[in-house]
Amino acid sequence: MEKKPLVVVNGLVRKDAIAYLKEHVDVRQWTEKTVMPREVLKEWLIDADGLWCVRPLDVDSDLVKNAPNLKVIAQAAVGYDNVNIDELTAAGIPYGNTPGVLNETVAELAFTLIATASRRILENANFVKEGRWAQRPSNIKGFDLSRRTLGIIGMGAIGVSISRRARAFGMTVVYHNRNQRIDDKIHKTTYMELDDLLATSDVVCVMAPLTDETYHMCDETFFKKMKNTALFVNVGRGPIVDTDALINALKTGEIDYAALDVTDPEPLPANHPLLDVENCLIVPHIGSYTDRTRYDMSILTADNIIAGVHKKPLKTCVNEEVNYKKPQMDVESALEELKKAGVDLTDCD
């Protein structure tokens, strides 16, 4: 019997995805609840054909330099700020992520945060639980979303999905990107320079990826340019925000409220000062955390790995230049396949 390719999984993932993976490859998985030591992982990779990357893990040339059989690395995530794509490309290793699968789910969470924060749902619910129904102060009254302006920073597919929900609530949507989209009329959105967006928006939602350019983009100067009545939402990446600057902006009234799915650091230590800020709602990075979406992400990751270890094209490859190519079919083989499919070629010139 032909030996199956070996895939290393450096952490805990869905059991159904592992079962699916094992139908096609041999799996060696780190099943401890602790983070797998990097040196141990490097030893495991010596004989591996594929790696299912589980955060936290920095993927670079150092990790894969002694893995001569490694043909693919994949991760159940859209973002890949923990992966050095240039170094993997130089090593000829395709990297697969999971775009498209989670767009609607993350957009739902982003707009849930916007709606929850705008009406101070958490604070008002707590007043009821505490038996203080009639004592809630006026500063948690909230505001309407209709006739307000939502500014989206990072208008990719998820941003477009958020904008669709915002318009259904009667909001005007503006956005800032590295480049203006060509489909503004279709989505009824307006491109703005960043400073104009900050000055105009009642809600600022960050959806940008983490890059050298976006690291700490939301700093002291950024928050000073926002309305002091504005709501700030981050569903992108934690390090895009200077956490100290955000804390100061919330405490001094430079902005009114923040709702965060991501933080820096992440997870937040129990004694972190951001947790003491009353006008800040934090959830533990649950943007894609629904059962169906996590399943779809896991299966797509498994499919990318299965394809890669067999040197077949990954469905979703970031560094497409080193993705495996479909073999070219010669004319005779193509005609034979058409005949097998029942195509009548007798009338073809």
Task: Set out the residue ranges of the language-model regions.
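Rossmann-like adenosine-cofactor binding region
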Residues: I46, V59-L63, R178-P273
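Phosphate-binding beta-alpha-beta segment of Rossmann-like dinucleotide-binding domains, i.e.
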Residues: P99-T149, S161-R164, D183, P313-E320
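Phosphate/diphosphate ligand-binding glycine-rich loop within oxidoreductases
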Residues: D49-K129
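N-terminal glycine-/charge-rich "phosphate-binding" loop or analogous flexible N-terminal tail
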Residues: M1-A48, G170, K325-M329, S333-A334, ...
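Short, well-ordered coil/turn residues at beta-beta hairpins
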Residues: N10, V54, A76, M207-L210, ...
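Rossmann-like dinucleotide/phosphate-binding beta-alpha-beta segment
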Residues: S138-N228, E336-D349
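Rossmann-like dinucleotide-binding domain for NAD(H)/NADP(H)
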Residues: Y95, T172, E220, T229-D349
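Short beta->alpha connector loops at strand-helix junctions that form conserved
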Residues: W30-K33, A76-A77, I93-E104, N177, ...
